[in-house]
Swiss-Prot record:
<feature type="region of interest" description="Disordered">
    <location>
        <begin position="123"/>
        <end position="170"/>
    </location>
</feature>
<dbReference type="InterPro" id="IPR040909">
    <property type="entry name" value="CHFR_Znf-CRD"/>
</dbReference>
<feature type="compositionally biased region" description="Polar residues">
    <location>
        <begin position="140"/>
        <end position="149"/>
    </location>
</feature>
<dbReference type="InterPro" id="IPR000253">
    <property type="entry name" value="FHA_dom"/>
</dbReference>
<keyword id="KW-0131">Cell cycle</keyword>
<dbReference type="GO" id="GO:0005634">
    <property type="term" value="C:nucleus"/>
</dbReference>
<feature type="compositionally biased region" description="Basic and acidic residues">
    <location>
        <begin position="194"/>
        <end position="203"/>
    </location>
</feature>
<dbReference type="GO" id="GO:0016567">
    <property type="term" value="P:protein ubiquitination"/>
</dbReference>
<feature type="region of interest" description="Disordered">
    <location>
        <begin position="351"/>
        <end position="387"/>
    </location>
</feature>
<dbReference type="InterPro" id="IPR052256">
    <property type="entry name" value="E3_ubiquitin-ligase_CHFR"/>
</dbReference>
<dbReference type="Pfam" id="PF17979">
    <property type="entry name" value="zf-CRD"/>
</dbReference>
<dbReference type="GO" id="GO:0051301">
    <property type="term" value="P:cell division"/>
</dbReference>
<dbReference type="GO" id="GO:0000166">
    <property type="term" value="F:nucleotide binding"/>
</dbReference>
<dbReference type="Pfam" id="PF00498">
    <property type="entry name" value="FHA"/>
</dbReference>
<dbReference type="GO" id="GO:0006511">
    <property type="term" value="P:ubiquitin-dependent protein catabolic process"/>
</dbReference>
<feature type="region of interest" description="Disordered">
    <location>
        <begin position="188"/>
        <end position="229"/>
    </location>
</feature>
<dbReference type="Pfam" id="PF13639">
    <property type="entry name" value="zf-RING_2"/>
</dbReference>
Amino acid sequence: MDGLGEKKPWGKLSRLLGAETESSSELFLYKKEWTIGRKKACDLSFPGNKLVSGEHCKITVNEESGSVSLEDTSTNGTVINKLKVVKKQTYPLKNGDVIYVVYRKNEPEQNVAYLYKSLNQAEDSMQNPADTSGSEEADTQTLSSQDDQLSYEEPQPSTSTSSLFSTPTTSASEPACTLLYKSQASVPGVQLESGEKSGESLEGHSSTSDATAHEKGSLGPPKKRMRTEDLWTGNKNLVSASCSKGASDESKTPSMKPDKMEETLTCIICQELLHDCVSLQPCMHTFCAACYSGWMERSSLCPTCRCPVERICKNHILNNLVEAYLIQHPEKCRSEEDRCSMDARNKITQDMLQPKVRRSFSDEEGSSEDLLELSDVDSESSDISQPYTVCRQCPGYVRHNIQPPPYPPPSDTEASRTQGDAPSTSTNFPTATQEYVCPSHGSHVICTCCFQPMPDRRAEREHNSHVAPQQCTICLEPFCHMYWGCNRMGCFGCLAPFCELNLGDKCLDGVLNNNNYESDILKNYLASRGLTWKDMLNESLSAAQRGVFMLPDYRINGTTVLCYFCGLRNFRILTYQYRQNIPASELPVTVTSRPNCYWGRNCRTQVKAHHAMKFNHICEQTRFKN
């Protein structure tokens, strides 16, 4: 703060409501522009607070006029006197304004608030001493932390007080009503409604000197006493209105922190209990349907983890938990008007894909989005109708979505197949797939692997064998790989005939009941004979066809269409039987000389290397078997 000696400060920020009471909680503003944010380069930096944006806001002063303004540049929003500042817009700062860098309704201990004080105005008020002032010390001494929270230089004194005392202060021993009265009675220079200057202010009540009070009289002149009572009556109504909001608020003053269940069931966007909640895939974070309806128009990222959202689903379990919680805590239920408003803003009436973002929304610094509903900032005119599911075969898909055609020119190169548009598993059905065009608002099904929609032609396949399979025979889950090729990164081919499934090079790792030692024995056996897992699969399928090997489902054979997971599960069943039928003469002596484990293949300790090396687990359980 070397600049303090060179340039006179024009304002001061005093920390409010925070747990820290350090000397650095008071900051003098002397530069023309003062920045606040999480970056270390900011003048007021919060490097460890993820609720603060990299460049949250900035305070500027007009050196000619002396006017001070605040511009919000954050993603979470800046709040002044409980009113959210519109992003990229400036807000004029007045003496006594409370600036919330972080505002959490249900977690006031996380609030980061500062009281702005204009030093020029403070000097003006100190240059006009009261007629009955006892000493100059009373005019020039620094206000206490509670007195600094109030300023009544605006025409309506209730503006700043109502915005400040609705949240708990650092003093938990006195109720809000008492603090309000004390502050109004002790702050010098309180402006009255009739516009009296410092000569008719309440300065007489702020003096603690008995001699000064004796000179003035116990209650001051009758006119002053009448104006004081009017001021107290007006603010008492404000306090009564705020206290009537909840019957149990007074009893909860010592511990404002919500219980764990309430924290779990709270939406981070509106900071209220979840209402008709939805979950995002793949991250599974949960929000109110109405809150996320407004969010998804501005960003395709999750407000919590910044993960790209692929799908939005109703969360019925959490909805039931919220309903049960509200039965036990009816005072925390939303008002009927609030619920109707949220239902009207809800655009997620069914499970759906994340729609295309219509306007950009800054995702700076990866900070957590904590939107506030303190003011009606978002325009209601941005509402759009419920989007319906479309796929690459829907009419007009290419026209509305600027993407390359879904089917590249026929090519036998591997590069064209890696894109997933011409998979080798669907070469028998290229014409029927490529020529199909979805009817208007036709039925679609979502691929379990890539979460992308495709036409639902499963019923049509029962009558037309040229339609590519779209679901697994065992689990009946839909997959798109055989229809037009799955485009998900890392997909080996999520749907294919059992004999053509690509299980990957690591499919033999822990393939025998997660026993790595037994699996390594099998891998060494195959390598010594120049065999691969594919050769073993074909040989095992032939044995299953002859009835030598058994599978849990009689329908499974080499041509059965299976998904990757069902195929891998049945591959492990066949692999165990293949290993069981290897003659002992073809295995090393160190393998065949081990005694059998009592628990056999059902042993839960075989995953430990020492136990797996000591006992053979390619056998059936012989002890404690029911």
